[in-house]
Design a protein with these regions (language model features):
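Conserved catalytic segments around the Walker B and adjacent sensor/switch elements
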Residues: 118-128
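Conserved small helical "lid"/interfacial subdomain of P-loop NTPases
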Residues: 234-263
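Walker A/P-loop nucleotide-binding motif
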Residues: 92-113, 127-128
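Conserved P-loop NTPase "ATPase switch" module shared by AAA+ and STAND
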Residues: 161-182, 186, 193
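Sensor-1/coupling segment of RecA-like P-loop NTPase cores
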Residues: 98-103, 190-221
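Conserved NTP-binding/hydrolysis module of P-loop NTPases
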Residues: 133-149
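A short helix-turn-beta junction within AAA+ P-loop NTPase domains corresponding to the substrate/partner-engaging
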Residues: 119-121, 214-238
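A short, basic N-terminal segment
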Residues: 1-93, 283-289
């Protein structure tokens, strides 16, 4: 059961998020409810408008802590600053880039945080939408474009809408999970919005290996897509074991201090430098406190 305090936080997040969309109807599509329901919720009518499951989905979408979860304070780690700068450039100048780096360094957190604060920027977790149709429909949904009709209509409407937006940005996280047809469709969508949309593809070693393998085997489409995304695999972490460990230690220290913790060495040992694991440790500590 979602209590009133959590619902109030969700409504505040909805009001803030509404600033990113040209209309309430567009945002309603993006968050998965209808415009009438959204209108009632924003006016304070919360009872029996949407299900608890829908409230839970909204809480997750806006990173609102529920139950035993506690909010985590964002910290400007090296990863955070690098990605925020890259995303800003890609959006402002309609550029495309690819980032391939270790898991657990804060790539996803930085990308999602950027999207919260910038109009016409969307985040897509490709591990959840691996096929061509699911990917394009999800992109359409995030922009507030109808995504439930015939696929050809959804694609055409999406292209038309993207071309009308002021500097849209699409962030593709876990892009290495996309299937071949989805990659080809990405190339087509990139072509249809050339110079009008920024793109940022992120992943770990799997994304880099996928491109390297298909480029080596000359699989159709990969060379063209690689060229469109800058023809290089960017990374944040330094080369060398010692330098990498020091990098991770610095990031752990920055996030821990931002969240009021001082036992840096203990946290580093427990997490092995992973910010994902640090999040779990922070939840444990805050729930005990």
């Amino acid at each position: 059961m979602i209590n009133k305090k959590i619902k109030q936080q969700i409504v505040e997040a909805l009001r803030e998020n509404l600033k990113k969309y040209p209309s309430a109807n567009k945002m309603a599509i993006a968050i998965g409810i209808n415009a009438a329901q959204l209108s009632r919720i924003l006016k304070g009518d919360w009872e029996n408008v949407i299900s608890d499951a829908s409230w839970l989905t909204l809480a997750r979408k806006f990173d609102i802590a529920i139950g035993l979860q506690s909010p985590i304070v964002a910290a400007e780690t090296e990863t955070y600053k690098f990605i925020i700068t890259q995303l800003s450039l890609c959006q402002q100048q309609s550029l495309s880039a690819m980032l391939c780096d270790y898991a657990g360094i804060g790539k996803t957190f930085a990308a999602r945080h950027y999207v919260k604060q910038h109009k016409n920027a969307i985040y897509v977790d490709c591990s959840q939408v691996k096929s061509k149709q699911k990917l394009i429909r999800q992109i359409a949904k995030e922009f507030g474009v109808d995504h439930t009709g015939r696929y050809t209509d959804v694609y055409a409407d999406l292209v038309y809408y993207m071309r009308s937006l002021d500097h849209p940005l699409i962030i593709l996280d876990e892009a290495g999970d996309l299937d071949y047809a989805a990659f080809l469709e990405l190339k087509a969508l990139w072509n249809a919005t050339e110079y009008l949309c920024g793109w940022y593809m992120m992943g770990a070693d799997g994304l880099k290996k996928k491109f390297e393998r298909h480029l080596y085997n000359k699989k159709v489409g990969y060379a063209e897509l690689f060229r469109r995304f800058g023809e290089r695999y960017q990374r944040i972490t330094p080369e060398g074991k010692e330098a990498l460990e020091e990098f991770k230690r610095r990031q752990i220290a920055i996030v821990a201090k931002a969240n009021g913790l001082t036992n840096i060495q203990e946290l580093y040992v427990k997490t092995q430098g992973s910010l994902t694991r640090l999040y779990i440790e922070l939840q444990k500590i805050k729930n005990v406190a």
